[in-house]
Curated annotation (Swiss-Prot):
Belongs to the class-I aminoacyl-tRNA synthetase family. TyrS type 1 subfamily. This is Tyrosine--tRNA ligase. One of its GO terms (biological process) is tyrosyl-tRNA aminoacylation. It is found in: Cytoplasm. A motif ('HIGH' region) lies at residues 39-48. Its main location: cytoplasm. The lineage of its organism: Bacteria, Bacillati, Bacillota, Bacilli, Bacillales. One of its GO terms (cellular component) is cytosol. Coiled coil: none annotated. The keyword Nucleotide-binding applies. It comes from Listeria monocytogenes serotype 4a (strain HCC23). It comes from the Bacteria. L-tyrosine binds at Y34, Y168, Q172.
Length: 419
């Protein structure tokens, strides 16, 4: 299947320039193509991942991806999709963010072989451009009326836009032109809000490289959820690729909780499963939705891709332990992942009567309630029911001498650490 046909089947094309020309190029040649991200934060979230998944699909089809981290454009801020001016970050923070993104993006692509990926930073070719060079060599090529008509600018005219953000599309166009000239880059990929920036780059390439210059643009549809909420968010906020911000277990759980109405679409967007494999999972969604086979496959594929096989195994282990209640099998690291969002308490490093211990920590509101819950078998320590009112909590009740997991009833968990 032609890569363009595959992207259309996956529902991953929103707009493209010269569809016939691009099809011919990718059929007949190995092309270089790029997608960029600005270092506005120290981690990508799963929404950022979408265009880079397309870039990876091109690599799998034998083409050469260029990953651009915007050390220069990140100092300005892309106005696309923003209702107000971005707050400028320090150069020091931007440099730190660049390095963090390099690490994350480095896990997604193959940097060896005939279709080896490369990673670039637009600061390298922008830092020495003087203001006079910028105005003479590039500003002269842009018509203000055309710039004002771009959606990214037009949507901000009423509330106002600074010259800094107004000029962003020129900088991004400079990137495409530079990569065309020095890396033979023929295609830019971006989200649906990047159409104006991409076409600005194509215009600049034609003016700088000649009318016969062959370059293309392709944008991806905005991914929406069936319930109308924003994709990539959970109750706890954005789903990050950085495991310190979103643990692999939380990452896995996000995908496992995908709505039946969305899961086939996500399988097409985010996994490298074949059409036949996805069709089979789609049938199971229709006939055996309670098995959640599609969600389990999606969660497994994404956790492996973004994190690792080991991280997936850990997420599965945590899920199984929480479902069965056998939490003693978990390591301290797995406990921190699986119980990140439960109420947490810090206990004294000393022995104490179970009833007193529960009340002192605040897990139980009173001794009367604590005695009642213990006596009724509603209290579990590390997965084991405790009904002994005289039980003494000591070091043997700690997992790896760090944590005690308390469960009240069927689902209410508490995590206790020690001073």
């Amino acid at each position: 299947m032609n890569i363009i046909d595959e992207l259309e089947w996956r529902g991953a094309i929103y707009q493209q320039t010269d569809e016939e020309g691009l099809r011919k190029w990718v059929d007949e040649k190995q092309i270089s193509l790029y997608c960029g991200i600005d270092p506005s934060g120290d981690s990508m979230h799963i929404g950022h991942l979408i265009p880079f998944m397309i870039l990876r699909r091109f690599q799998n089809a034998g083409h050469r991806p260029i990953i651009l981290v915007g050390g220069a454009t990140g100092t300005i801020g892309d106005p696309s999709g923003k209702k107000e001016e971005r707050k400028l970050q320090s150069m020091e923070q931007i440099s730190k963010n660049v390095e963090s993104l390099r690490v994350q993006l480095g896990k997604i692509f193959d940097f060896e072989g005939d279709s080896a990926a490369s990673m670039v930073n637009n600061y390298d070719w922008t830092k020495d451009v003087s203001i006079l060079d910028f105005l003479r060599d590039y500003g002269k090529e842009f018509n203000v009326n055309t710039m004002l008509s771009k959606d990214i600018v037009a949507s901000r005219l009423e509330v106002g836009i600074s010259f800094t953000e107004f000029a962003y599309q020129i900088l991004q166009a400079m990137d495409f032109n530079h990569l065309y000239e020095f890396n033979d880059c023929r295609l830019q990929i971006g989200g649906s809000d990047q159409w104006g920036n991409i076409t600005a780059g194509l215009d600049l390439i034609r003016k700088k490289q000649g009318e016969n210059a062959k370059a293309f643009g392709l944008t991806i549809p905005l991914l929406t959820k069936a319930d109308g909420t924003k994709f990539g968010k959970s109750e706890g906020g954005a789903i990050w690729l950085n495991p310190e911000k979103t643990t692999p277990y939380e990452f896995y759980q996000f995908w496992i909780n995908t709505d039946d109405r969305d899961v086939v679409k996500y399988l097409k967007y985010f996994t490298f499963l074949t059409e036949a494999e996805i069709d089979e999972l789609a049938k199971q969604v229709e006939t055996e939705p309670h098995l959640r086979a599609a969600q389990k496959t999606l969660a497994a594929e994404m956790t492996k891709f973004v994190h690792s096989e080991e991280a997936l195994e850990q997420a599965l282990k945590i899920s199984k332990a929480l479902f069965s209640g056998d939490v003693k099998a978990l390591t301290a690291d797995e406990i921190e992942q699986g119980f990140k969002d439960v109420p947490t308490f810090v206990a004294e490093d000393s022995e104490a009567n179970l009833v007193d211990w529960l009340v002192t920590l605040g897990i139980e509101p009173s001794k009367r309630q604590a005695r009642e819950d213990v006596g009724n078998g509603a209290i579990y320590i590390n997965g084991e029911r405790q009904q002994d009112l005289e039980k003494i909590m000591d070091a043997s009740d700690r997992i790896e001498n760090k944590f005690t997991i308390v469960r009240r009833g069927k689902k209410k968990y508490f995590l206790v650490s020690y001073k």
